[in-house]
Swiss-Prot record:
Belongs to the Tlp family. It comes from the Bacteria. This is Protein Tlp homolog. It comes from Clostridium botulinum (strain Langeland / NCTC 10281 / Type F). Residues 53-75 are annotated as: Disordered. The gene is tlp. InterPro entries: SASP_thioredoxin-like (IPR017524).
Length: 75
C-alpha cells in the first residue's frame, strides 16, 4: 500500500475557515446568552465559548506555524 504524500498546500485555508466558523459560533452563543433567562443554558454557553476561545488561540498559533512552513517550503 502506498502512503499519501503530505499535501499541506491548503492547510492555512482550512485553519482559517475553522477560525471563522468558531468566531461565528461564539457570536451566536453570545446572542443566545443575552436572550435567555435560563441560568443553566447561560452557564453551558459561557463554558463552551471559553473552550472555543482557547481553541482559537491554538488555531491562530497553528496558522502561524503553517504560514511559516509554507514560506520555508515545508521542509
Amino acid at each position: 500500500m502506498k502512503n499519501k504524500p503530505d499535501d499541506r498546500k491548503d492547510n492555512v485555508d482550512k485553519i482559517q475557515y475553522n477560525i471563522t466558523k468558531t468566531i461565528q459560533n461564539c457570536e451566536l452563543a453570545d446572542e443566545m446568552i443575552a436572550k435567555t433567562d435560563d441560568e443553566k443554558t447561560k452557564k453551558t454557553l459561557i463554558e463552551k465559548n471559553e473552550r472555543r476561545r482557547e481553541a482559537l488561540d491554538g488555531m491562530r498559533e497553528e496558522i502561524k506555524d503553517e504560514a511559516r512552513d509554507k514560506k520555508n517550503g515545508y521542509m
